[in-house]
Amino acid sequence: LVRSRGLGDVYKRQHQTVRKGELSTIMKLVFDKADLVKSVGIAMKAVSGKTTMPILECILIDASSNVIKFTSNDMELGIETIVTGMILERGIVALDAKIFSEIVRKLPDNQVTIETDENLVTTITCEKAKFNIPGQSGEDFSYLPILETSDCVSISQFTLKELIRQTIFSIAANENN
């Protein structure tokens, strides 16, 4: 799930002492733009449009383990997707989904680096483009429940499409029907 795509020694980070006034990087990730756009698009489907809880307008980027996960939750629907990328420094940050999505979609087709400092300011870099956006702590984010996968049903894609095709006539054309 996590791959390096030949970045190898270019991104190996040596521990450096941080001078007074400088911020250290607490998370650093590298993605291919296409993988990032696809994953952000999936996560955006569960981002709340209007809410009294600002954290629900965010996508949680969790690179605290060996995989990178994007999670969004509107308290009715939750989505967690695993993103292909390289973890250079582990960390967690919640970013405003709308701003993050707009930035990612407009970046050049190249490698994208996402870095977050100790103040949760996140820098998104791709070629000459560089954006700084404020992040939020992932502690306030509403995590999805862990589901037991022992009770599952598997059907083929063809069967599912056929079931939908045979029943789609019964849905209402609008809310009033």
Positions of PLM-derived features:
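Single conserved hydrophobic/aromatic residue that forms the stacking wall/gate
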Residues: 1-14
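Structural preference for solvent-exposed beta-strand-turn elements
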Residues: 15-177
